[in-house]
Amino acid sequence: EVNAIRLCAERCNEKDIKALEKAHENFLKYYDTPERVSHDFAFHRAIAEGCHNPVFKAMLLIVIPDIMAIYQRDRICAPTSNVLEEHTQMLDLIKKHDGEKAAALMAKHLQGVVDFAKRKLQAP
């Protein structure tokens, strides 16, 4: 996803930006509901669409259903204010076509998921 957002910022068009804005708007709307996770992933899916790379898009679509199930089961996607802020900042950086800053922010945004995956790999 770090490379996907970099490419999205570099390659996105007006249609992609509108889709990202709509996904972000829905994420905000459903933030305090159980639907938050699906709208969170819709935002990430819109980033994959906007990068115009079919491999990134296909890979994300393959893993999303399983990741969503794990997130909901283990409740690792608890609402935090930094998630809202990070999504807003990512959208702004994409609109500015700043791929490097967007990629750095995505890496930070996904660090909790990386840490969770490492713990799961080390668990008996």
Where are these regions (language model features)?
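…primarily DNA-binding HTH/wHTH and HhH modules…
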Residues: 122-124
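Conserved amphipathic alpha-helical segments that form helical-bundle/coiled-coil interaction surfaces
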Residues: 1-73, 82-89, 101-116
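Alpha-helical DNA-recognition elements
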Residues: 119
